[in-house]
Every structure is written in structure tokens, then in C-alpha cells.
Amino acid sequence: MGPTTATDTGARMKPTTVASAVHRVQMALYDGAAASREPLLRAAASLLSGPDYADVVTERSIADACGYPACPNPLPSEDARGKAAPRFRISLREHRVYDLEEARKFCSERCLVASAAFGASLPPDRPFGVSPDRLDALVALFEGGGGGGDDGGLALGFGASGDGKEVEEGRKVEIMEKEAAGTGEVTLQEWIGPSDAIEGYVPRRDRVVGGPKKEAKQNDACSAEQSSNINVDSRNASSGESGMVLTENTKAKKKEATKTPLKMFKQDEDNDMLSSCISDSIVKQLEDVVLEEKKDKKKNKAAKGTSRVGKSKPAKRPVGRDGHEVDFTSTIIMGDRGSEMMDHGALGQYNFSSSILANEQPSSSQYAAIDSVQAYTEELDELFSNAVNIAKDETSDDSGRCTLRSSLKAVGSKNAGHSVKWADENGSVLETSRAFVSHSSKSQESMDSSVRRESAEACAAALIEAAEAISSGTSEVEDAVSKAGIIILPDMVNQQQYNNDYDNDKDAGENEIFEIDRGVVKWPKKTVLLDTDMFDVDDSWHDTPPEGFSLTLSSFATMWAALFGWVSRSSLAYVYGLDESSMEDLLIAGGRECPQKRVLNDGHSSEIRRALDTCVCNALPVLVSNLRMQIPVSKLEITLGYLLDTMSFVDALPSLRSRQWQLMVLVLLDALSLHRLPALAPIMSDSKLLQKLLNSAQVSREEYDSMIDLLLPFGRSTQSQASLPS
């Protein structure tokens, strides 16, 4: 690379590619086009990759300029930096070594950090599929043909003039929202839009409603919400219903709102979204009510034969102390089953009458308000009924007008023991509330059931605790049950029934049968102490354990039990040098039955064998050094491996110390010295070395001999070997 002053005119006329655009941008950055103009450098991030930017930094540092393209400063001179400046720097505080070769490409630490951050933000590869117009605009921006300016990042199609208005530098995109179509004929340009327009832009307020099709319904609902008082019961709103009380001004202002549907959205954006959400919820609730009305009519036809719906009482609008009217309120009272049919029959009606505990008579203006509210409700119902094409039955006085579902009962309620009644039909609320006293017995039953539930949960928790302890292997079944606090009582009911059946069928000669042979045996799962009140000592397996008794095995018992489980017939045959035909003669060895080799199918035997090989390999070199053996360790390992191949590994390896593992290996070598490794016989007969090793493992000579008897049940003399069954 080298500094350039002009670009070839013929190259500019050719179609711009990504590679050529990257090269021209690199040359511009090399010449200092982005010096003191970081926005212009950020604009290059849309085209450059990480390696491309690294090349720019390297070339600028070779030209004795700061590697950061946005920095106009040159690199420090050799005298300022020092001729023998080290390449690496060791930080004693951070315990790290820093390479100063990269830092020499920049004039300061600030430029080093800024360049590293900018390079890390670039993608590893160049962009693919960039339009030629965008490439030309970007190249022109760096070469001075795109308007320049500090705000270079806006040159990719947008710009900003001094007064803040948008100036077209490339392609200008303008977002336009379609206005509401007016009445009459429109031109094709107005109906379709510009030829280069892009469809798909949806205003934010229409995203909530669901599209322009519901715009008229949304505007009507918004106008009704803003010009009327709507009280929505939160308990009924969750189930899709809302209790609404509308004033008399609703009908009068409805037409005004429909004439100017778009003027209402000229307010603040947050208020528009809030009002649209409220109106949309009301529209959906009313539509759901109309859709469910058809299902309710089928239920009403079945209920007409048994009950008829009476007309509701006229509403009473009380007057407050200050002379103003009181809003409509409703009182929900739980009644008996007899009143359920009346509520079910009137389920499809909007009843705006309320039970007001007052004696004042409503005025004529209040009656007029009620009539206007009912009239507007009819119009709303007709509007949504026509939308879903539901035919209305107007055959009787009770269902003379299209009605909506009452908001006093939740949709889908299946509680047949409750109903909704007006307070003025059953008297005062205080008198009706006395009916709840009869439910005291039910509350007592629920309390008993809760106690039983808690007891069952406690039992389940104890059983889970005992099962986890048993499955983990930390304790036996009896100990786990005892620790969990579970006491297993004998089944006295079944025992008594069994005794009665036995007494009826027994013979005269069987009177001397013991009690334990006649009934269900009561065997507790844990040891019984003398101070227990639940069982007698006679019912337990054994008496109280003596003082100082412990179930923990000693180190010798642990090693002896491990050898006892490992030895098989194949092991004895290998130790005595017998073939497979003589293995059946080793069925009884040393007065006990010697089992065959067992291998677990789940692969645990091989895992135990690999773990044992590790323990043997760790203990064998130390043992060879202490006993001064002249046999190579490799030969000892091979012979011990053949012996381990004949053993059964079913249980987990015991937890032994290194001295104890050395003693276990010594027992195996002592058994192999009889036939397989006769060179070890003089070493094994040295009592001083053997006793020293036994003392370190805390095992006596008698205990060692008992372990040898497991592998040499027929003795170690040659006469004993010759007398083996053949």
C-alpha cells in the first residue's frame, strides 16, 4: 500500500463490487479520511471485516502514523520510545506477560484500546449481497463525493441538514400511513398507492386491535368509553364478562364519534394505546356473549317445561345525601337450589335493576336514563348479532328483545348448590347472611380432612426418607425405618380374624399347638429395648444388645470378608496348579463349599476389577522394596493378574489404607509362592520381615494365617498338594 491522491476515473465507471469497495475504503482510511471523524469510521464497519481492518492498522503503523484511523497523530519517534525498548513487559502485580509489539503501532494507550474495541466489533468475513448503490454511496462518502461531514454514518441513504430536516443523499425511504377511504369514486393511484410503495407497514394502534377491518368497531367502542361511565367488575372480567352501566349521553354521542373516527387518535401515543386496549376488550367481550347466546337458547328450551322466568322488579335509583344520583350497584347473595332455575332462565338477560337498601322513589329523569341505557344495549346487541349471523327468536314476552348474558354469574360454573338472587327478593342482606351458619358442620369436616391430609403427607415424607436411605446403601432396612420414625404395628385385626377361623376348624388333638404357630407372626423390624411400651421382649428377634456392642467391623474382619467373597474354585485350582477337569473335586474345601466364579451382567464386575488393579499396582512396588524381592515387578503383576481373573467380584471394594492393601497383596503372593512363584518361598518364610509388615497393618500372625487358609485350604506342603483329589 502507499498513499493515493486520486482515483482512476475509469475504475469509478465500472460496477462496484464488495472487494473493490473494501479496497477503496482501506485506501481512504490509510490516507487519513477518518482522522478526527469517528462517525465516519463507524460507517466503515458495515463493509470491513476484522482482517481488513487489521491490514489498515499495519499499513498505517509502517507509514509512521497511528494505527487507529480516527487518530491524526503520528507515532512517537525512535528517540522518544528508546532504541533498546523491550518487546515484552512483565506485570508482577497481575502475574502476566504483555507483548508490546502490538502497542508500538499506536501513539497512546487510548488509541490501542479504541482500536481493539472497534476491531472486535467487526465480523470475521465481509458482507455478502450488498447492493451496488449502497457500495457507491459508501465509497463516495469516504472519497469526498457524498457530502462528507462529521456525521458520516447518515450517508447510507439518509442525511441531516442544518435545520434538522432530512436531506436525500442516496435513496430516501418515506413511511406513509393510508388515510381512511372516503365516499365516492377514487382514482387508481389513490386506491393502490405509488408504484414503488412497500406494503406491510402496520401502525402501532392497529397491531393491538388486529388490523384495519376492526377500525370502525374500535372507534365506536372508544367513543362509547370516553363519553360514558363504565364500571367493570374485576371478578367477572377474568371470565370474559363485564358488568357495564352506561349513562344517557351514550346514545347521543355515538353518532358524533362515528363521524370523526380518526381525530380521536391525534392525542398522545400512550393514551391512544390505552383507550384502544379498553375498547378492544369490550368489543371482544360482547362478541363472545353473542356467540354463547345460541348455546344458552338450547339450554333455555329444556328448562322452559319446568320453570318460567318472571319479570324483574323495576330498578330503584336512590338519591344520596348530597342530592346526586347513586351509581348502579348489585349484591350477590348465595341462595338455595330452588332459586337456581330462576337464575338459569334469566341467564341471557341484561338486568340493570339493582337492590338498593333505600326507601326513596326514583324520579322521572332516572327512569328516562334507564330507558336510554336499555335502548342502547339493544342496538349494541343487534350490531354484533348481525355480524355473526345469529337469528333471534322473539316469540315470547320474556325473551322479547335480544338480550345478553348476565354478568352476575361466571361462564362455565358447575356449582349446582349456589345461585344469584336480588337482595330485595329475600329481604335484607343481614337476614340472608344467617344462612351461612348451617355450613359450620361442613367446615368441621373440611378441617378433619385437612388433618388427615397432613398426616398422610407426613407418612409419605417418612417413607420417602427411608426409601432414599435404603437405596443409597447408607443404612439397612431396619435402621432406615427406625431413623425415619416409622413404627410398624402388628396387624391385630387380621390376627383376631385368623384366630377365630382357626378355632372353628381346629381338631381336638391340636390343643397343644403353640401360640406362635396359630396366629400371624409378629416380628418387628428393629431391635426392641427393655424400656419400650410398644412391644414385649418376647416379640423381638433378640434381646437388648450388650454394652459396647458395635456393628462396625475391624480392619482384619473387613479384609477377611473381602477375600472370602473373592475366592472361587478357579482361584484354588490356579493356586494349586490344577486343570479344569479337577475343579469339581474342589467343591468342598476346608469344610466349606467353594462357589464358582460369578460375573455381574451389568458390567459392575469389570469396574470393580479395574479399581482393584489400581490398588494392587500402587501397593506392589512398595511391598517389593520392603521385602527385598529379586523378581521383576512386571512378572509379579502378570501372575497376580491371572489370579484375579479367576476371582468373583460382586460387592464393592472395601475402604482400606495403603498398609492394609499391601497386606492383601502379600497374602496373594504368599499363596502364589506354593506353585506359581516358588522363588518367593524363602522370602515368605522370613518371620522378621513378615512380622514387621504385619505390625504396620495392625494384624496379628494368627489373623494372617486365617486369611492364608482361605486361599490354601489344603495346606502348603507338597504332600498336601499330592493328596488333592484327582
Curated annotation (Swiss-Prot):
Q: Which Pfam families match?
A: RPAP2_Rtr1
Q: Which parts of the sequence are annotated with region: Disordered?
A: 209-242, 294-323
Positions of RTR1-type zinc fingers: 43-131
SS bond partners: none
Quickly give the catalysed reaction: O-phospho-L-seryl-[protein] + H2O = L-seryl-[protein] + phosphate; O-phospho-L-threonyl-[protein] + H2O = L-threonyl-[protein] + phosphate
Cite the GO molecular-function annotations of the record: RNA polymerase core enzyme binding; RNA polymerase II CTD heptapeptide repeat phosphatase activity; zinc ion binding
Domain of life of the source: Eukaryota
Subcellular compartments: Nucleus
Regions of biased composition (Polar residues) lie at 220-241
> What is one term from the GO cellular component aspect held by the record?
cytoplasm
Question: Which keywords label this protein?
Answer: Hydrolase, Metal-binding, Nucleus, Protein phosphatase, Zinc, Zinc-finger
Under the heading PROSITE patterns, the entry gives: ZF_RTR1
Q: Which residues bind Zn(2+)?
A: C66, C71, C107, C111
Which portions of the chain have biased composition (kind: Basic and acidic residues)?
A: 209-218
Quote the EC number: 3.1.3.16
Its function? Putative RNA polymerase II subunit B1 C-terminal domain (CTD) phosphatase involved in RNA polymerase II transcription regulation.
Q: Which family does it belong to?
A: Belongs to the RPAP2 family.
What's the protein name? Putative RNA polymerase II subunit B1 CTD phosphatase RPAP2 homolog
